[in-house]
């Protein structure tokens, strides 16, 4: 049984972790351009120029500058609270995971179909969205 004052060891490496290796002083330097190359190779293999970013800003930044011919779509999830819609990180993280599952289950391959996401009360908002940031709103959380 875990008690309130029990110590817990870290169970994953955060991207911001300082970790000195021969490749650099943190995980960004350790990975270098390997992750970007892998993602771009996968897009090429899929014959796609669409990259749906469901990562946090911290993790997505490991890709570095994405080539201009890649269409990066970064959905935003907003919940209604205190009279307005705003991003609540806890719910947004969960929504990104829900969308990832939904994309796989529905075999979504284009931006238009992404707008059909309607899981857990989120609905696409044309008025709030841009060409690279589709916004999904939810009244109840």
Map each language-model feature to its residues.
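Internal, well-folded beta-alpha domain core
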Residues: 1-129, 135, 139-141
């Amino acid at each position: 049984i875990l008690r309130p004052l029990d110590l817990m060891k870290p169970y994953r490496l955060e991207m911001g972790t300082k970790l000195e290796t021969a490749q650099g002083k943190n995980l960004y330097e350790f990975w270098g351009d390997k992750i970007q190359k892998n993602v771009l190779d996968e897009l090429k293999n899929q014959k796609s120029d669409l990259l749906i970013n469901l990562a946090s800003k911290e993790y997505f930044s490991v890709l570095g500058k994405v080539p201009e011919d890649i269409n990066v779509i970064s959905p935003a999830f907003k919940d209604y609270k205190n009279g307005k819609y705003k991003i609540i990180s806890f719910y947004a993280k969960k929504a990104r995971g829900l969308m990832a599952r939904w994309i796989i289950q529905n075999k979504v391959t284009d931006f238009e179909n992404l707008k059909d996401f309607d899981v857990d009360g989120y609905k696409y908002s044309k008025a709030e969205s841009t060409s690279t940031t589709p916004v999904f709103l939810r009244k109840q959380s």
